A protein has these predicted regions:
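Alpha-helix initiation/capping motif
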Residues: 1-3, 60, 112
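Active-site nucleophilic cysteine motif
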Residues: 1-13
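An alpha-helix initiation/capping motif
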Residues: 2-3, 24-26
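A structural signal for alpha-helix termini and helix-coil/disorder junctions
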Residues: 11, 15, 53-56
C-alpha cells in the first residue's frame, strides 16, 4: 500500500519517499517486516518517520487537496492486509473532495469519506 502512495508522491514532486524500501522486498509479509525494521512499528509509525524526514506538513483532513497523503482505516475487504497493518492503510486524496484512493486486494479502492487518522500536504 505504501508504494502506491510513494509512487504518487514521486510523480507529483519528483521525490522518492520510499527510496529506503524500493527493491528490498517481494510480497506483503516481507513488506510488513521492513516497515517494522524501518520505524519499529506499523504503517502509522512508518508514515510519521517518512513525513518528518521529507518535511511533509501535517494538514487538517478537511483541507485535503488532490494528491495529499493520508493514513486511514483499511478497507475491510482485504483481511490479510488489515491484520498485518493493524487496520491502517495509506491513501491519496482524489479529485473528488472527500474521496481517497488506496490499494485494495484486487486493485485501487475509492473510499468516500473514510476514517482518516492523519493527513499530509504534498
Amino acid at each position: 500500500c505504501c508504494m502506491f502512495v510513494a509512487d504518487s508522491v514521486k510523480s507529483v514532486t519528483g521525490i522518492d519517499i520510499s527510496e529506503w524500501f524500493r527493491g528490498r522486498y517481494q510480497g506483503r509479509s516481507k513488506a510488513f517486516k521492513l516497515l517494522k525494521e524501518f520505524a519499529q512499528g506499523s504503517v502509522v509509525e512508518t508514515m510519521e518517520e517518512i513525513t518528518t524526514k521529507y518535511g511533509m506538513k501535517e494538514t487538517d483532513p478537511g483541507l485535503l487537496m488532490p494528491g495529499d497523503v493520508v493514513t486511514m482505516k483499511a478497507n475491510p475487504l482485504d483481511p490479510i492486509a488489515g491484520r498485518l497493518s493493524n487496520g491502517v492503510t495509506v491513501g491519496i486524496e482524489s479529485f473528488t473532495k472527500g474521496s481517497i484512493f488506496s490499494p485494495g486486494k484486487d486493485g485501487l479502492v475509492l473510499s468516500m469519506r473514510p476514517h482518516i487518522y492523519k493527513a499530509w500536504a504534498i
